[in-house]
Amino acid sequence: MKGIMVQGTASDVGKSLICTALCRIFARRGYKVTPFKSQNMSNNSYITVEGLEIGRAQGIQAEAAMEEASVYMNPILLKPRNDREAEIVCFGQAVDTVSGVKYRDGFYKRGLEAIKQALATLSQSFDMVVIEGAGSPVEVNLNDRELVNMKVAELADVPVILVADIERGGVFASLYGTLELLQPNERKRVVGIIVNKFRGDPELFSSGVQWIEQHLGVPVLGVLPHLPGVRIEGEDSLSKGQVTSVLPRDQSIDIAVLDLPYLSNYTDLEPFRYEEDVAIRFVSSVDALGRPDAIILPGTKSTFHDLQILKEKGFKERLHEYVTTDGTVVAICGGFQMLGHRLIDVAGSDTGIKGATIDGLDLAPVETRFAEKKKTVRSLGQLLHPFGTAKDIYGFEIHLGETDIVDPSIPAFLRVGNHTDGVYLHEGRLIGTYFHHLFFNDDFRSGWLNTLRRKKGLRERPTVELEKCRRASYDQLADEVERVLHVDSLLEKMERWGETS
């Protein structure tokens, strides 16, 4: 299995997006391509058809490659629970929650074997692999036990492209420093450089390309432009940004998302990028909230902690005032759990303290108990109270808590198997659910937004076909990258590497 690995001079230089583009480019050229990232650190998950959990970025890259995502594409996923600990997900299933020191000391050998197994499995079904690195390959304090960069390139025996972000400044120093800190055998793997996020006429950087090639001895395979029009999901919180409407504020739907410290699966909001009259802003204080057209209370990796923060900041009282004065709220997963009267950490799975309790926001008649085993599943269901033409919905669930309705209430959804989910209160102005990707359902999203539009005196808009838009985004990204990247030269380098290794 031939391949290429994309490494970067730092985090958030564009590795994920470039890997996504390469997956699409190579797939369009007839290759059977798989993405791969040995170890991902993110609270944004992708649930495979088997109900197993991988990093969202590799799920997106699999879609770009026109392949079904599998756990072998991301064998290790680390999900931060606080500043010191992270949950380890190995081959799609949670296995432990440990500190960084304990992880390095106790998990390295197991992680190495998982990576070898994943690469071997993928090689049986694919003829090309596009591997994404993490952070920088020259974190010298970590490199004795690294599992994400040059060690993976060695295991897969593939050449490396080094990506640098010119937008943040210091592109020459970052490239020079990275190459200088690599070991000689590692530097030999670097067959090309990509300068990313360039603004303006690339001819203005021609002397920069010459300097890099003359002084560093590595060819520049492309100078990629800044691509603000490409709507591909970011990997993690480093890429989290606001969604800006193309219309004036008084003609737009203003949605405020409560910016939780351990916010997870914020990709639930991605569909709004394709709605031209929707603006999304992340809000971390009551003063900044204002009077939005809707509030979204998203998921979190640390429900108790983030709920306590919301209460300390005065959001409990503010949300009560907002809901009782005709405001609209949608709460997803951890946000849904927060809506209730009380949360009980029976197993200590959220707080580490068995039996810990906390009062909720008291907006819905529900109570949540946290168990030991996490539920991860793709879900299908029906809306019991349709918005517009919406009826059937799909999504996925990732949660430790189980939520019970403790007073008469109206569930929002009926899942396959005749199980109910969520709450539907105040004639649909307050919805809580465990369904991630609720807004990926075109009819639901359209019906919900049109309700907000009518309420604001705006005209209704036709349904945006999300899947069609996403496919077009992958092709647009591939077109933009293929226009400036020397793809044929890259393929030649990959072929030659395979022949000589």
UniProtKB/Swiss-Prot annotation:
Q: Which UniProt keywords apply?
A: Cobalamin biosynthesis, Glutamine amidotransferase
Instruction: Name all GATase cobBQ-type domain ranges.
Output: 252-444
One family name in Pfam for this protein: GATase_3
The entry lists its GO molecular-function terms as: ABC-type vitamin B12 transporter activity; catalytic activity
Annotated pathway: Cofactor biosynthesis; adenosylcobalamin biosynthesis
A GO BP entry is: cobalamin biosynthetic process
InterPro entries, per this entry? Class_I_gatase-like, CobQ_GATase1, CobQ_N, CobQ_synth, GATase_3, P-loop_NTPase
Gene3D superfamilies the record matches: 3.40.50.880, P-loop containing nucleotide triphosphate hydrolases (3.40.50.300)
Where are the catalytic residues? C333 (nucleophile), H436
HAMAP family linked: CobQ
As for family, the record states: Belongs to the CobB/CobQ family. CobQ subfamily.
Q: Its function?
A: Catalyzes amidations at positions B, D, E, and G on adenosylcobyrinic A,C-diamide. NH(2) groups are provided by glutamine, and one molecule of ATP is hydrogenolyzed for each amidation.
Protein known as? Cobyric acid synthase
Q: What is the organism of origin for this protein?
A: Halalkalibacterium halodurans (strain ATCC BAA-125 / DSM 18197 / FERM 7344 / JCM 9153 / C-125) (Bacillus halodurans)
